[in-house]
Amino acid sequence: MVRLAAELLLLLGLLLLTLHITVLRGSGAADGPDAAAGNASQAQLQNNLNVGSDTTSETSFSLSKEAPREHLDHQAAHQPFPRPRFRQETGHPSLQRDFPRSFLLDLPNFPDLSKADINGQNPNIQVTIEVVDGPDSEADKDQHPENKPSWSVPSPDWRAWWQRSLSLARANSGDQDYKYDSTSDDSNFLNPPRGWDHTAPGHRTFETKDQPEYDSTDGEGDWSLWSVCSVTCGNGNQKRTRSCGYACTATESRTCDRPNCPGIEDTFRTAATEVSLLAGSEEFNATKLFEVDTDSCERWMSCKSEFLKKYMHKVMNDLPSCPCSYPTEVAYSTADIFDRIKRKDFRWKDASGPKEKLEIYKPTARYCIRSMLSLESTTLAAQHCCYGDNMQLITRGKGAGTPNLISTEFSAELHYKVDVLPWIICKGDWSRYNEARPPNNGQKCTESPSDEDYIKQFQEAREY
């Protein structure tokens, strides 16, 4: 009640003062008895206003559109516009002077105050301005009090942005799960089984939360996910990497078998049909061709059909040359090896597995490789190369590799009939077999074995 009474008294005093000044200006009698009495009344009202202002120093009121224009004109004309002091009213959060949204009132933007004189006395009136936050309300960031620092105080919007930034950073750089599959069957004699350094079977999930890129204890990080298979059909390979220390990255690869490429059977259908005549079919059986009293191996060697001549010519021109040393990359997966004679890359794969039976068909060989078919191939043949314990190419003798007229990649059955069965017919006499299927040494590698060992092997084959 005291506060309301003080405000009413203040408003009444201002109204009377305004009316009095208006009357004085209209009459023009500034030195008469009435003027003296008016001056006394004005002094009395001014004293009352000062008393009321002292007792209600914390009183504030809101400027509204309904305030009389004369009151605003008089206030602006005789009093300097005060620097705004902002208070927190009950239920209405008003901005304090220290907040980044505080601003100075721009008089030209207010029609009622545009002509105000701000050089008069200040009646010590406090003005509370309420600013409602909204998308269209922006603070004046260019004006700051003299004693304020150049940076602004964090606002709730800034805090929300910081939380969103932290969540995005965590999503991009941390808390990633890596699936590790240790049950894949892709190991061979040069590649230890996958997961040898992890004892838990099946799938494991590695969490990299709050860890550096690599483990400082053993110098190895977690394996990345396997890459996409390098081919969409046929035989390809996949790779994955992990950190092994500073400026060190370990790479691991494995084979991935996709469905056969469409069209390869159609591409080689004619050749497969013609070659099947040599292997045996309902119309022609190679084993029945030879009589009991004839040398079957000799008959096989002397069979020189026009198709076979043309086919062998294509084989010699189509197949790559054997590398002089065993390419160790084929032990892990199929590999592309550049052929300097053909001037292009050829895909190779390891052929040293148990099913190759090297101890029977290639007794002195330790490793063998076989070229792979491609859509550019004009035949179904594959180059077959074998290597000794020193990983050097065996160019002659019983351990040397010979071209396969039918690749096992196309048909294992036809390969057996065309390439393996003649060796059986010749009773393992590699000297005659290699005469019909000479080993490849297109890159002019060092002859192996030595002349002495080769002559010894040749004599043993003849005596057998």
Curated annotation (Swiss-Prot):
Residues 218-262 form the TSP type-1 domain. Interacts with integrin ITGAV/ITGB5. This is Isthmin-1. PANTHER family: ISTHMIN-1, ISTHMIN-2. Residues 66-76, 138-147 have a biased composition (Basic and acidic residues). It comes from Homo sapiens. The C-terminal AMOP domain plays an important role in the anti-angiogenic function of ISM1. Glycans are attached at N39. Residues 51-63 have a biased composition (Polar residues). Keywords: Disulfide bond, Glycoprotein, Secreted, Signal. Residues 50-98, 135-155, 173-219 are annotated as: Disordered. Its main location: secreted. It comes from the Eukaryota.
